[in-house]
């Protein structure tokens, strides 16, 4: 079983693809390595998908769930596999930001999908504290059942029946208590101490956002775009338009990671 050991965590890793470039793929909070697994086969090179601490099949230390800790996970996996590119969703994007704020040249190119935080307090703590409390003390099977049969998800599953199976994959965690600790740690922290630190990131960055997402506001993407001189911003008008445009988006991301900045021409 492929693993990367850090000072305080054992990180589970899966690799697909071959050759260059090598891209490390970092998932969002409460998700796991499966998050983008359906799309990485359409991206050139080698893709290193891993579970952050507390998530999936990785270990769940008692402490160490700040953004700098998730950035250490990202850096450790990238170093172990020689990754020169990184893709991160939400928490994963925050981990990239945290790492680049301290080491601006760490990656040659990065993709930030649905960034959720920068240098200020998270505005939805109560909602996520309730989620953490729901997970705490449950077995893996009990936690998965609680998510799949949560009343607030019923309407969503009626609209999009396929979403239940996606959630079944993404909420596959060995340590629900670890996920709860991760949630509590992240919502009480922020990716960078000062947004101005990101002005030092001169490598190409592709930012992908959706209008109307309160957790991952498109305005944050615009702020990040203004901070990083070599960044490109894609803003989709709705979640539906993002899903409808996924084949084209995957092609854009692939071209961008291969060095084609024109593939990242702004949508918004």
Report residues per predicted region.
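Active-site loop/oxyanion-hole signature of alpha/beta-hydrolase fold enzymes
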Residues: 49-87, 251
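Gly/Ala-rich beta-loop-alpha elbow adjacent to hydrolase catalytic centers
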Residues: 88-96
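Conserved alpha/beta-hydrolase "acid-adjacent" motif
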Residues: 214-220
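Catalytic active-site module of serine/aspartate enzymes centered on a nucleophile-bearing elbow/loop
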Residues: 230-268
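Conserved alpha/beta-hydrolase catalytic His-Asp/Glu region
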Residues: 122, 138-184, 188, 197
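Conserved HGGG/HGGXW glycine-rich cap/lid loop of the alpha/beta-hydrolase fold
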Residues: 7-59
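Short beta-strand/loop motif that positions the catalytic acidic residue
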Residues: 201, 207-209
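Flexible "cap/lid" loop of the alpha/beta hydrolase fold
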Residues: 97, 101-137
